[in-house]
């Protein structure tokens, strides 16, 4: 007795050719000196589970999952797992291209990262019989739309704008009070105010005296624990000033 392992193809099909020879050592009118026989035997098909191709994903955006089926009659159930979340992508479908939008709420499980890793599992059915399951890791990124919500209130820390209705060159100091909150579990980590080459940090930030006059642009940047940023841009009017000569 001898065991032989035969590899099946991607459809689970295989065949083998068997042959045998017999030699008697003598011959007569009733007995041949040798015999040989051969034949091809088709082996039972081993059902193959389907495979899944997963692209890079962005939470909240639709993407296409591609299914490769060993048999056109097979159907599939696809589920996902991500942190504390799980759900069904498709239920017993025969489609080979499946649109899926990973929920944006999954970002709650990665408050300190801009990308995360989950698992997609495809279970293959022939009729009502489950043939097997395969799991695939996927990476999904948090979209820029999940950056902090922020507003800013500006004033003149030196008080000149209250008197003159505008900021004053080399006298006024720009003060920015920024109110912000993170989205989907993220926390606000940083605030930066920039104007005319000056910078200041913090939710309440005050620059040095403004060196330029005219319509001057400012930028307030709010960064969260994922590294996502919201940028607030605007302009202020700065009156020219020269010290008496």
Task: Give the label of every model feature segment.
Residues 3-15, 104-118, 206-215:
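Surface-exposed, short loops/turns at beta-strand junctions within beta-sandwich domains
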Residues 20-22, 122-126, 222-224:
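Conserved structural position at the C-terminal beta-strand
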Residues 27-41, 130-141, 229-237:
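Edge beta-strands of extracellular beta-sandwich domains
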Residues 38-50, 139-150, 237-243:
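Extracellular interdomain linker/stem segments of modular secreted and single-pass surface proteins
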Residues 53-61, 156-173, 245:
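Short, solvent-exposed loop/linker segments at the N-terminal edge
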Residues 61-72, 80, 174-182, 245:
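Aromatic/hydrophobic beta-strand junction motif of beta-rich domains
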Residues 89-98, 194-204:
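Short beta-strand segments within Ig-like beta-sandwich modules, predominantly Fibronectin type-III
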């Amino acid at each position: 007795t001898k065991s032989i392992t035969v590899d099946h193809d991607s459809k689970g099909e295989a065949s083998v050719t068997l042959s045998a020879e017999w030699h008697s050592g003598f011959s007569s009118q009733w007995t041949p000196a040798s015999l040989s026989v051969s034949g091809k035997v088709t082996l039972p098909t081993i059902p193959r589970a389907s495979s899944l191709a997963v692209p890079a994903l962005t939470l909240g955006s639709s993407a296409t999952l591609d299914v490769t089926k060993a048999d056109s009659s097979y159907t599939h159930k696809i589920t996902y797992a991500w942190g504390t979340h799980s759900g069904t992508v498709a239920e017993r479908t025969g489609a080979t291209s499946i649109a899926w939008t990973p929920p944006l709420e999954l970002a709650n499980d990665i408050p300190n990262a801009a990308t995360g890793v989950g698992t997609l599992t495809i279970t293959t059915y022939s009729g009502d019989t489950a043939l097997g399951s395969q799991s695939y890791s996927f990476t999904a990124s948090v979209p820029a739309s999940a950056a902090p919500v922020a507003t800013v209130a500006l004033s003149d820390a030196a008080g000149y704008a209250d008197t003159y209705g505008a900021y004053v060159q080399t006298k006024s100091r720009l003060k920015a009070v920024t109110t912000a909150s993170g989205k989907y579990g993220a926390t606000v980590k940083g605030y930066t105010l920039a104007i005319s080459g000056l910078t200041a940090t913090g939710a309440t930030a005050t620059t040095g005296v403004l060196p330029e006059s005219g319509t001057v642009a400012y930028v307030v940047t709010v960064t969260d624990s994922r590294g996502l940023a919201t940028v607030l841009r605007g302009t202020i009017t700065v009156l020219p000033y020269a010290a008496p000569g």
